[in-house]
Design a protein with these regions (language model features):
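Acidic, low-complexity terminal tails and accessory targeting/binding regions
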Residues: 1-3, 39, 45, 76, ...
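Active-site-proximal alpha-helix that buttresses catalytic centers in soluble enzyme cores
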Residues: 2-4, 8-73, 77
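Short active-site segment of divalent metal-dependent hydrolases/proteases
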Residues: 12, 154-155
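Amphipathic, non-transmembrane alpha-helical scaffold segments
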Residues: 29, 33, 57, 98, ...
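Generic structural signal for well-ordered alpha-helical scaffold segments
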Residues: 37-44, 127, 131-139
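Short beta-strand scaffold positions
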Residues: 54-55, 128, 149-150
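Short glycine/proline- and acidic residue-enriched helix-loop micro-motifs
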Residues: 104-125
Length: 204
């Protein structure tokens, strides 16, 4: 059995008001830095990870670095963990997108599995990428604990895959900043032990 600890990066500017950050490389805020430190402590106290994989964006690298300092695990950047490519929507607020692409914005919330972002990706593209990371973990880290630091969208997609749920259920899973999800990966099945656990952040 391989244990997967799935973490979303800490708080960044651009969460409020809601906007499509995508691949814009924004650093952790001061709150996000504290999130990362608390998450690192929680992981170090509970598990002994042997490897940490992160998205190539700075907010995930910063979060992964905090976990590495606390656990002494090695960190590797994985391009396939990059955030969803929102194309023309990137860095626009939800209000801006709704005003300009009202029908597609409505579809994104009603049927996300049917959307391809203008000059960007679809959820199917995202799942194909994060699945590569999952296969690598299963191949190279049998009977180990591995941390993956990713983004809201990628983490949701990965959890849906592990839960054997369709992409139409995208909005039924949530991923808060520095939330932890724990998954046991067995040879023929996976067991999701917790999703979006944030008890370690109550002091922030």
């Amino acid at each position: 059995m391989t244990r997967l600890i799935l973490v979303r990066h800490g708080h960044v500017e651009g969460i409020h008001p809601p906007r499509f950050r995508g691949r814009r490389d924004v650093a952790l805020s001061q709150t996000g830095i504290r999130h990362a430190e608390l998450t690192a402590g929680r992981i170090a106290r509970t598990w002994r990870p042997t490897a940490i994989y992160t998205s190539p964006l700075g907010r995930c690298i910063q979060t992964g670095a905090a976990i590495a300092r606390a656990t002494s695990a090695c960190t590797k950047v994985m391009e396939d963990l990059n955030d969803l490519h929102y194309g023309d929507w990137e860095w626009r607020t939800h209000a801006e997108v709704q005003a300009r692409w009202s029908d597609l914005f409505e579809c994104w919330h009603a049927a996300p599995h049917l959307v391809r972002f203008p000059h960007g990706e679809s959820l199917q593209d995202l799942v194909a990428r994060v699945s590569n990371v999952l296969r690598l973990i299963l191949d190279q880290h049998q009977k180990e604990t591995v941390v993956v630091v990713g983004h809201d969208s990628g983490n949701r997609a990965l959890l849906l895959q592990l839960l054997d749920q369709p992409l139409s259920a995208y909005w039924r899973v949530t991923q808060d900043p520095c939330a932890i999800s724990e998954v046991e990966l067995h040879a023929r099945a996976s067991v999701v032990r917790c999703i979006n656990e944030t008890q370690h952040l109550v002091s922030v």
